[in-house]
Structure formats: structure tokens, C-alpha cells
Amino acid sequence: MKRKIIVGSRRSKLALTQSNWVINKLKEQYPEFDFEIKEIVTKGDRILDVTLSKVGGKGLFVSEVEQALSNSTIDFAVHSMKDVPSSLEEGLVIGAIPKRESPLDCFVFNQVSSLDDLPKGAIVGTSSLRRAAQLLKHRPDFNIRPIRGNIDTRLQKLHVENFDAIILAKAGLARMGWLENTTLKLEDIAPEVCLPAVGQGALAIECRESDQLIRDMLATIHHEETGICVEAERVFLKKLNGGCEIPIAGFATKIGEQIHFKGLVGNADGSKILESKEIGENPGQIGNKVAEVLLSEGAETIIEELRNK
């Protein structure tokens, strides 16, 4: 009889698609195992009428899943990396980070087809303070309005609630097959306009530190370059003690042996944005260095002001 591996996942279409993608990759290597998904509802899934920045706290989409891991209800969990706090629960580790999808944010337009064509005062939907702050720096005339829900729900709201545009992660659109939908008016947002969230486009597969069988299994789908880049980003996030209530962005790429990392902290209306870049070979050192530069330039004051609102 085959051993069954229980995989923890949120129950959104995107989360289940991502979990099934991981399972199919593992089945190629381990046909002797059966895999079963256990759907878990998180705090972030239950609270849909409030923006995440107002809910506060860390791990809004992972805490209940980590609890299931800690009490051995599941064997591993599949998360979107950008949802995973910079510090994990004791006894848990990231067992693998597969190859990253696009890290970029993406405009989905209602009528026009490019950022430059959006009219003055355009209504743009996003509940991300990171996206809002950077867009307002670029276009202070924008009217940013919160929008929650899964990808399908947000795409419906684009028209029903008369947004001029909404912003989604391109990776989610890709995984759900929406990039092939020719009826959508899409445009990538350059990192110079909107730097991605830490870990955006990457998956995090979390397991128990003590479960060597699962760790060995997950190691077969780990992508080293993605892991190195995400490490730099997450070290940066941890140093700043960031969460979804702070406009923080961080994005690393690897060119040859060099890691190129840019980090950003801003206030909610985009009137003050601090940025720093670093190049080097050690991801942890680079992430720390960029965070230290931003802290020396006043990032701590921005973060405290936002937390005390």
C-alpha cells in the first residue's frame, strides 16, 4: 500500500492550482507515494471586508496552515512566498522554493490599454499599501481604492465596480491561465514604477524541520537561484520587521555570480519613498546592508508612524 502524503493548502483556486502543480512535480520523482490535499481556511480568507493592512499582524494566510504542520495534521504546505512571514514558527522550515514565476505586478485595464492612457483621477484597485505608495509616487492623481477577493472576484469587480484598472500579481494570472485570455487588457508594471513584494512570484513549501523524508523529497524541486534571490529579500524584510501594514518592497536577481538587490520603504501616500541598491555574492549580507541603509535614512520613523496609526 502506498504511503499517503497530506499537503496543506488554502482553498482558493490559485492556492489549489499551486498545490497541485507541486504535487505533480513530486509525483514525477516519487510515483510510489499518494498525495492528498487538505484545504485549510486562514484568517486572511475569512476577513474579506477589511484591507489586510487594517487587519494587522503577520501570517494572515499561513498561521492556521503552520499550526496543522506543527501538530502533524499535514506533511507539508504550499504557500505563496510573499504571504510567509520572515520568521517561521519554531520547528518549521522552508523545504523548497521552486523556480520563480514572473515577480512583476500587472495592470488589468477596464477601457484603456496602458498606464500612460489612464485619465487624471483614474480609479485604481489595490489593497496593497506597497503598490499604492509606489503608484501614487508615479501618479499622485490616482484615486486608489481597496479591492479584496480571489483573482476571479477581482476581475469581476473591475467592471462591476467601475475601476479604471486593478493591479494583480502576474504570477497568479500566469498560474491560473489568464495570460492566454485575449479579452483581458494587461500591461506589466516595470520594477522602476512598482518594485515587487518580497518573494513575489515564488512558492514556499514548508515542512517540519525533523521530517527528513519530506525534506529530501522537497529538495528535488528546489531551484537554487530562486532560493538565493528570495533569501536576500527575506533577510531584508526581517531586518525591517516588515508586514503587510507597511509599504515595503524588495527584489533580487542573480546575474552570473552577482546578486543585484533593490529594497524600498515608503509611507502610505507615496510622498516619501526610500530606496537602496546593493550588488554582491552573499544574499544575507546584501539584504542586511540594504535594510541598514534604509534604516539610517529614516525607514524606522516611517514604519513606526504607520504602525501607530
Curated annotation (Swiss-Prot):
- Residue numbers of S-(dipyrrolylmethanemethyl)cysteine PTMs: 244
Q: List the record's Gene Ontology CC terms alphabetically.
A: cytoplasm
Which keywords describe this protein according to UniProt?
Porphyrin biosynthesis, Transferase
**Where does the source fall among the domains of life?**
Bacteria
Cofactor mode of binding and number, as noted: Binds 1 dipyrromethane group covalently.
Q: Which reaction does it catalyse?
A: 4 porphobilinogen + H2O = hydroxymethylbilane + 4 NH4(+)
Q: Which GO biological process categories is it annotated with?
A: protoporphyrinogen IX biosynthetic process
Question: Which pathway?
Answer: Porphyrin-containing compound metabolism; protoporphyrin-IX biosynthesis; coproporphyrinogen-III from 5-aminolevulinate: step 2/4
Required co-factor(s) are: dipyrromethane
InterPro entries, alphabetized: HemC (IPR000860), Porphobilin_deaminase_cofac_BS (IPR022419), Porphobilin_deaminase_N (IPR022417), Porphobilinogen_deaminase_C (IPR022418), Porphobilinogen_deaminase_C_sf (IPR036803)
Gene3D superfamilies reported for this sequence: Periplasmic binding protein-like II, Porphobilinogen deaminase, C-terminal domain
Recorded GO molecular functions are:
hydroxymethylbilane synthase activity
As recorded in UniProt, its EC number(s) are: 2.5.1.61
The UniProt entry's sequence similarity note says: Belongs to the HMBS family.
General remark: The porphobilinogen subunits are added to the dipyrromethane group.
Quaternary structure and interacting proteins, as annotated: Monomer.
Which PANTHER family does this UniProt record tie to the protein? PORPHOBILINOGEN DEAMINASE (PTHR11557:SF0)
What the protein does?
Tetrapolymerization of the monopyrrole PBG into the hydroxymethylbilane pre-uroporphyrinogen in several discrete steps.
Question: What is the name listed in the Swiss-Prot or TrEMBL entry for this protein?
Answer: Porphobilinogen deaminase
Q: What is the native source organism of this protein?
A: Listeria welshimeri serovar 6b (strain ATCC 35897 / DSM 20650 / CCUG 15529 / CIP 8149 / NCTC 11857 / SLCC 5334 / V8)
